[in-house]
Amino acid sequence: MATSKTVLPDLDLAKIRRYCEGRVPTRLRDRIRIELDVRGRSVTIFECRPPSTPEIGSDWTRFPIARLRRVAARGVWMLYWRDSDLRWHLYDRVAPSPHVDPLLAEIEADPTSIFWG
């Protein structure tokens, strides 16, 4: 079931949140965090880093890693990657899935180094 704020299944959102929270050990979270933004049918995963110098300010830099998009009509999730021109493209090395688990596994494995570098 989806919450009133989103059109995405609560269980899937919880899995994505757990993935993000578990990606970086607690002891390193003052230097790097993995966060997510939910907008409509999409969840974007970000790598976040603190400013390199205090003069820059206190805002962390957010670099988009991957986007998961729910296609409700088909009941599947699709995975996207971002290019250097800031455009999103369908990642075609993993099939759309009714569950986020295989897509999160592909992001983690990153066989093409397109997500984590």
Regions found by a protein language model. Give the residues of each.
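Negatively charged, low-complexity tracts enriched in Asp/Glu with abundant Ser/Thr
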Residues: 1-58
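Amphipathic alpha-helical interface surfaces
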Residues: 12, 64, 99-100
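Functionally constrained cores in energy, signaling, and assembly domains
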Residues: 12, 70, 106
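Generic preference for hydrophobic/aromatic residues in regular secondary structure cores
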Residues: 36-38, 65, 88
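Short, conserved beta-strand/beta-arch hydrophobic-aromatic motifs that form part
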Residues: 46-81
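Short, compact, well-ordered microdomains
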Residues: 74-117
